[in-house]
């Protein structure tokens, strides 16, 4: 599976898992929300191990840009708040950084 696809799936798993904690602590949802949340966070961590790189730190650094894009998608789709131009500009800069990390000659 291509690194971008793994990173995108990992981002969805992490955001969904973290949102369950947000829902529990900030929105007053049941603590039972944490069960699928913890499973989702475990899937997130497992997915990052699937990236073809010998260095974990590099995998995490490249993942950061993808996470930002996925978070803004979550903001728009799940929370109904449209990202503004500053969100999009920041995401573009972060994505450029991720691309440099992923494409760098090694």
Curated annotation (Swiss-Prot):
First-listed, main subcellular location of the protein, grouped into a coarse class: membrane
Residues that span the membrane, as ranges: 4-24, 31-51, 61-81
UniProt keyword Ribonucleoprotein, yes or no: no
Recorded GO CC terms: plasma membrane
InterPro entries: UPF0060 (IPR003844)
Keywords from the named record: Cell inner membrane, Cell membrane, Membrane, Transmembrane, Transmembrane helix
Membrane topology per record: Multi-pass membrane protein
Protein's cellular compartments: Cell inner membrane
One Pfam family linked to the record: UPF0060
Keyword Manganese on entry: no
Family: Belongs to the UPF0060 family.
Entries under PANTHER family matching the protein: UPF0060 MEMBRANE PROTEIN YNFA
Protein name listed in UniProt: UPF0060 membrane protein Smed_0659
């Amino acid at each position: 599976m291509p690194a971008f696809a793994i990173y995108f799936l990992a981002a969805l798993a992490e955001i969904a898992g973290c949102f369950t904690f947000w829902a529990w602590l900030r929105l007053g949802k049941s603590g039972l929300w944490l069960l699928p949340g913890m499973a989702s966070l475990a899937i997130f961590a497992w997915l990052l191990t699937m990236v073809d790189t010998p260095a974990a730190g590099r995998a995490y650094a490249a993942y950061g840009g993808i996470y930002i894009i996925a978070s803004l998608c979550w903001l728009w789709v799940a929370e109904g708040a449209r990202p503004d131009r500053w969100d999009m500009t920041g995401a573009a800069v972060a994505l450029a950084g991720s691309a440099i990390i992923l494409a760098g000659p090694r």
